[in-house]
């Protein structure tokens, strides 16, 4: 191949170990569109704007649900959880949405007061929409880790119930996010142009 790129530093390390060549690291395609471009396809949400915490975890643990519950109590906001296949009892105090599709997912993030997630895409869209957010165990996921360190928001990772004290509804630094994404979009687009 003439050109190989990956989405995070961890993958670049692995490719280099296997091939002896260092691939370039570029943005995940999710970040190539702006918030306004994503809003054009999101659906309306039938829930109070800005008056809920969105919880989106692909494989939620009991510990994460306990942390989410503690955050809900601290901030006095209900939790809306997007669920697809998990039927665990510890979800009971939350508002459940089983039928949310991709365009609903975007809207729920955009209209939340706070996003709690363990997923890359939950984190990515929180950044794109400049939403206050926290990531469960974000430093253990290569893609999440790469983007948080790139922007300088690694403090948005929460690992245990002891981290609940730092959770708040303060806005993330939208300018810092946009400056980073604008630069990386330009770099990624230039790479694609040259590679094709």
What are these model-derived regions, one by one?
Residues 1-196:
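Active-site anion-handling motifs in enzyme catalytic cores
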């Amino acid at each position: 191949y003439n050109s190989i790129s990956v989405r995070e530093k961890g993958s670049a390390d692995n490719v280099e170990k296997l091939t002896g060549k260092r691939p370039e690291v570029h943005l995940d395609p999710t970040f190539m569109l702006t918030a306004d471009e994503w809003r054009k396809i999101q659906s309306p949400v039938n829930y109070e704007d800005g008056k809920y915490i969105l919880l989106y975890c692909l494989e939620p643990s009991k510990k994460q649900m306990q942390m989410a519950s503690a955050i809900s109590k601290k901030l006095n906001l209900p939790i809306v959880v997007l669920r697809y296949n998990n039927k665990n009892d510890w979800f009971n105090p939350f508002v459940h949405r089983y039928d949310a599709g991709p365009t609903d997912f975007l809207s729920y993030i955009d209209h939340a007061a706070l996003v709690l997630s363990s997923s890359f895409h939950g984190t990515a869209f929180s950044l794109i929409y400049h939403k206050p957010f926290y990531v469960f165990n974000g430093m253990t996921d290569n893609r999440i880790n790469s983007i948080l360190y790139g922007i300088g928001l690694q403090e948005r990772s929460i690992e245990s119930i002891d981290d609940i004290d730092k959770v708040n509804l303060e806005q993330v630094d939208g300018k810092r996010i946009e400056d980073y994404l604008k630069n990386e979009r330009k770099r990624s687009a230039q790479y694609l142009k040259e590679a094709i």
